[in-house]
Every structure is written in C-alpha cells, then in structure tokens.
Amino acid sequence: MFAILGATGNAGRATIRQLRKRGFKVRAVVRDESKAQDLEALGCKIAVADLHDAAALAKAIEGAETVQAICPISPRAPDPAGNMRAIVGTICKALVATRPAKVLAISDYGAELGAGTGITLPFHFLEAELRKTGVALTLLRSAEHMQNWSRLLRTAAETGVLPSLHHPLTKLFPMVSARDVGIAAADLLVSSGPQASPRLVHVEGPRRYSALDVAETLGLALGRTIVARELPRSDWIAALIRGGLGASYAALVAELYDAHNAGLIDVERGATDICRGATEFGDPSIFPPALVAAAAPPSSKSG
C-alpha cells in the first residue's frame, strides 16, 4: 500500500495515476474529501487528515509500506515558512509513529543551502528533519514547475509583456512539469533493491529555458507577441503582492529569485542522480486551452 500526502496537487495526482496504472493499491491522504472524487474513481482509498494533527496523520498513513510526503506552502499565510515548518513537524511525528518501510519526500532545488533561499529554505528544514526520523528516505528535489508561469498569463495577455524576476533574460534555468515530477516519484516509489539513505534525486525537464523562451511560448499560447522584460528588483515585492501573494510570501519569493540570479538554485554540487522529464515547456498540458481562454481580456473573449 502506498500512502500519498498532498494527493490533490498536480504532482500528487500524477504519482497516483502512475501507481494505479501499474495496479498498486493507493491511499490518498487529503484535507478536503470533496476534492478527491476523481482519486476515488481511480480506485484510491481516501483518508482525511489535517496536516497540523500528528495523530490524525499517523492514522491516515498507518499500515502503508511506502509514503510520499509533499509539504504544501500557503502563499497567503501570515508566516508561510513557519506554517510549513509546523507541517514538517507533524509529518515527522506521524512517520516516527508508523515507521513505514520507505518514504519519498518531494523537495526543491537549492534545499541543500541553509540560508538565503527564501521560500526554498523550509525545504532545507524538511530534509534535515526527515533525516532525523531514521526512515529509509528518498529526497526528490524538483526544479521550478512549468505550470507556475500560468499566474502570468493574464498579465501577458492584457499587456503583451512578461515581467521576469529571472535576470538576465537570456539566463537558462531548470524547469519541470509537475506531471513529470509525479511520474519520477512513482518510478522511485516502486524501485526495489538496496540504496543509500537518504537517496538524493533531482528532477527537471528535457532542457533548460530562459525568460525569452517563456515569453515566446506564452505568445504562441495566447496568439499574440509577448515581450519579456526584466522587472526591476525594487518592484518585485509590490508586483508579487498585486499578483495575490501575501506580503511575507512575496518577500520569500523575492529572496529566492535573488538566489536564482546569483546562480545558487541548481543541482547540488557533486550530485549525479538526475531525472529528466519528457514534457517540453510548450506542451499543451502546461497551458491547457481552457486556462488560456480564461486569461484572455474580456474584449478578446467577446470578439
């Protein structure tokens, strides 16, 4: 039995689909059962647990031989990093109580760094705390998700401009489809044989991209020319808040992109276990037609 935390997220759902395709039993651990109907239709058992309740989470994963842990981030929480650290504590208590044979945790590029990485820093804490549990552990560090750029579809559609926190615009950086993260996780979950603990694996897409590539892809999806422009550092936090992020989260994102632009967010030095997903950034699954249509300005929808 595989227990999947964060089952309703993009990566969690992709892991579950792969496991069910291969005939494995899956228990989907969710906070809101109403969002798990499609998972139930796939044949999953559904367990409901609050990620701040260690006893409830332990009950949800009890009996599972293998657990996939995904620690969510709350962009509008007053203290997003503190909230995530609290959830990490809950997850670790549940794992110690239930002692599954194998745990895979989805982490983040740059998680080896202990300072200066903004919203990636809680993943450093996640990895450190999981190591203390003594469980057989695989750390799957994910590059930036391609799907995250959908947040800028509306801005690009309305203005013809892609404001970029990646500086310079020509700088190549790793990205990966959330679906490919889930597929890589499923492969690792079912792998057998002896392995080092923790096993460290990085996952990114088939190649690296620049902000110029992103603008070109958004332009093709939207049917108009999109120009990438470096957003001045002094404007980052205000722009992120206008985009719907809480002030604390916006500050953490800004610090992360400072680290990105300094070349710090990458495969850990000396690491060799790198999985490359097959999905290109221009794949229709990244920006489905319905998502693109919803981002179009009202005038273009009516026309």
Question: Where do the protein language model's features map onto the residues?
Answer:
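Aromatic "clamp/platform" in nucleotide-sugar-dependent glycosyltransferases that forms part
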Residues: 83-88
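Oxidoreductase cofactor-interface core, primarily capturing Rossmann-like NAD(P)-dependent enzymes
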Residues: 1-27, 31-41, 52-55, 59-62, ...
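Terminal hydrophobic/aromatic helix or amphipathic segment near a protein terminus
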Residues: 201, 215-262, 299-303
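A general structural signal marking secondary-structure boundaries and capping sites
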Residues: 192-193, 260, 295
